[in-house]
Amino acid sequence: MKQLTGAQIRQMFLDFFQEKGHAVEPSASLVPHEDPSLLWINSGVATLKKYFDGRVIPQNPRITNAQKSIRTNDIENVGKTARHHTFFEMLGNFSIGDYFKEEAITWAWEFLTSDKWIGFDKELLSVTIHPEDEEAFTIWNEKMGVPKERIIRLEENFWDIGEGPSGPNTEIFYDRGESYGNDFSDPELYPGGENERYLEVWNLVFSQFNHNPDGSYTPLPKKNIDTGMGLERMTSIVQDVPTNFDTDLFMPMIGATESISGEKYRNGDLEKDMAFKVIADHIRTVTFAVGDGALPSNEGRGYVLRRLLRRAVRYSKKLNINRPFMFELVPVVGEVMKDFYPEVLEKKDFIAKVVKNEEERFHETLHDGESILAEVIAKAKEEKTTVISGVDAFRLYDTYGFPIELTEEYAEEAGMTVDQAGFENEMEKQRERARAARQDVDSMQVQGGVLGEVKVASEFVGYGTVATESNVVALVKNGEYTDSLQAGEEGQLMLDVTPFYAESGGQIADRGYLLADGVKVVVKDVQKAPNGQNLHKVVVEEGTLTKDAAVKAVIDTKNRSSVVKNHTATHLLHQALKDILGTHVNQAGSLVTSERLRFDFSHFGQVQADELEKIERIVNEKIWESIDVAISQKAIEEAKEMGAMALFGEKYGDVVRVVQVGDYSLELCGGCHVDNTASIGIFKIVAESGIGAGTRRIEAVTGKSAYELMNDQVGLLKEAAGKMKTNPKDILTRVDGLFTEVKQLQKENESLAAKLSNIEAGNLTDSVMTVDGVNVLAAKVNVADMNNLRTMMDDLKNKLESAVVVLASVNDDKVNILAGVTKDLISQGYHAGKLVKEVASRCGGGGGGRPDMAQAGGKNPAQVEEALAFVQEYVKSVSK
């Protein structure tokens, strides 16, 4: 067996399958594009669903990839086991209706055993198959020469994740030798069992059935191959190390952590070894996820990242690291992965900044968690229990990121324990929710539909022309082929030549008409068909449209003109954002219509008003410079060398379309654009907002829409100036003057209210009653708000020196209640917080506070007098 690095194994796998006629699919972003069913890309096949379910027909039915993936369903096991990871790479080869079992098995065996490739000893390999898969048994036994005793039949060798493609699978295992297990009385010591000796190398899935909604299985019209080989596990076997963490994919991060901590990995302390592993795993995940646009937050993907970072920081304390340090490991990850993922090093500064910021926040959160825990302990003592509930412990862990181990330590210091069973029960509930979510999202669509069968050519020529003489080459109604569409009927069609742009890259589809003698057809929408043709959604307004009809296809040029202005403006905006906010800005989505443009982008924090102003000015300056827009076809590598931006979620072929705005903007784009920026006219930002963790959105208008917006704003300005009896240019001065007048009136009003309050407070002293030797005052007063109530309360307490006072006011059907107790009475057991809570409850409200002063609110003004009457009862109850 050869000595290989993890990077060499990855490249060798891809090279092997390229030799077998496979197209290499680039590793997709971890953040799923147009697949809301997934939180993360979690397998090699996840990005290929569109091919397997027939929505898109790949140019090459043979595909191979090395796909970065994230799975977080077993975070607690990371570091405890030899092979659990949150981030991993899955190597795979796939066949979409092309080759099947024999080729898949033959090539897998060749890659693993040939001296040209991995070079495993055949005698150390065993395989598992489904008990009824005689075809796989025959191939393994008769063609590959695997002895019967090393072909194990297991019922679980059937891949099925719900509705959609399913089928038997075969797994290949490597025997690592007796040092990893030689107790043959162990019922799990066999290939496919739970043991450390026989490691699964490769899983080959033969998708040959459809799992139907009624639970039945029917043969697929096209049989598929889906295989997966974990790079980390394969590397541990090739490098002959005990765990994945001991490979060159993890050791550089572990080594860097050793340098930071002064501790040593594999020095006899299992707890410290686990800490090293957790840190190495989690920094890989966070680095790649942030690089792909995810940012820490309290929801969704962001919450996963926050949880991973906090778990790593917690484990770092076992290595005596008590400061932010994970950010220092980001460039180490970049160096390890630079051969296949050079973008990590390119983004390392931004990723490190995000990680450091989150670490610093967690160190602050630890203090917050301590405060919450102190309240939990105090509450438990008040309830005379020595056990912190599992629900409270889980809330600290899940909401505040407070480690259960720390909760146990604090509890022990307070002479208490934690309900571990209750905590584990809450954890299991969370796992069940995660498992249910995964089952819901992993199933694929069922194959079918006539559109996937349409192979006729349809050429898009709309970059250079707005009308064509075309022929209807395919006509569909209600999902089935048809020969004609009558007036009033809707359908879908393909043209041999079309000027209509199909929606993609954020740009909406063209609208327009198909015209012929006596026939008028409205084109409402255009989308890409599974085989890449432009598919027109139409409704017949006049006449009858037939298949093979000759028509004139005409787009709505007014609509297209507005769209292209917004599209080119989007490119200018993208570059301006990078100029002002930083190179970390990446497109996270866009919408380009005739009315407006919407641009979503990655950015950590709100865009400030002065930044927006600069961004808007840059875009307008580029418009006013009248820059020519050049469009060319380039080889993908040449385009990247030129510095062209490749956009989020887009797939590119060997030859790409490059859109260049002078020397300012350079992007790969298949959309429609103006010839010169001057055509855009003007650019105006309408709104900026946050739409999720680390993602911002800018909405803007150009051209006529921008003119109309500014006209409306000028009109509003003139109207406001008229009402203020001033000129538009003097309106700010007038507004400042009005603010000054309002502030002066507020001061006068407050002064008058204070005087009235003092007068009313003076009159109230005549209403003081003595209850069991205690001065008691409970009154409804006429004041504007709680602040005036407090002023009156302070005045009364000073005048009365010793008293229990409750004041209530009603404004706009809202009840304000304030209770006060002088210091001498607090020591006798009187408590303003408890009193105000009781009073408020009697008029539909609630509240509380300190022993000397407390406030509350109520909802039923009619019950205020009755509520105040309770004050005497309260005083009597305390004085007993």
Swiss-Prot record:
It is an enzyme of class 6 (ligase). It comes from the Bacteria. Consists of three domains; the N-terminal catalytic domain, the editing domain and the C-terminal C-Ala domain. The editing domain removes incorrectly charged amino acids, while the C-Ala domain, along with tRNA(Ala), serves as a bridge to cooperatively bring together the editing and aminoacylation centers thus stimulating deacylation of misacylated tRNAs. Zn(2+) binds at H567, H571, C669, H673. It catalyses: tRNA(Ala) + L-alanine + ATP = L-alanyl-tRNA(Ala) + AMP + diphosphate. Binds 1 zinc ion per subunit. CDD domains: AlaRS_core. Catalyzes the attachment of alanine to tRNA(Ala) in a two-step reaction: alanine is first activated by ATP to form Ala-AMP and then transferred to the acceptor end of tRNA(Ala). Also edits incorrectly charged Ser-tRNA(Ala) and Gly-tRNA(Ala) via its editing domain. This is Alanine--tRNA ligase. Its cofactor is Zn(2+). It is found in: Cytoplasm. The gene is alaS. GO terms for cellular component: cytosol. Its EC number is 6.1.1.7. Keywords: Aminoacyl-tRNA synthetase, ATP-binding, Cytoplasm, Ligase, Metal-binding, Nucleotide-binding, Protein biosynthesis, RNA-binding, tRNA-binding, Zinc. Belongs to the class-II aminoacyl-tRNA synthetase family. The keyword Ribosomal protein does not apply. GO terms for molecular function: alanine-tRNA ligase activity; aminoacyl-tRNA deacylase activity; ATP binding; catalytic activity, acting on a protein; transferase activity; tRNA binding; zinc ion binding. GO terms for biological process: alanyl-tRNA aminoacylation.
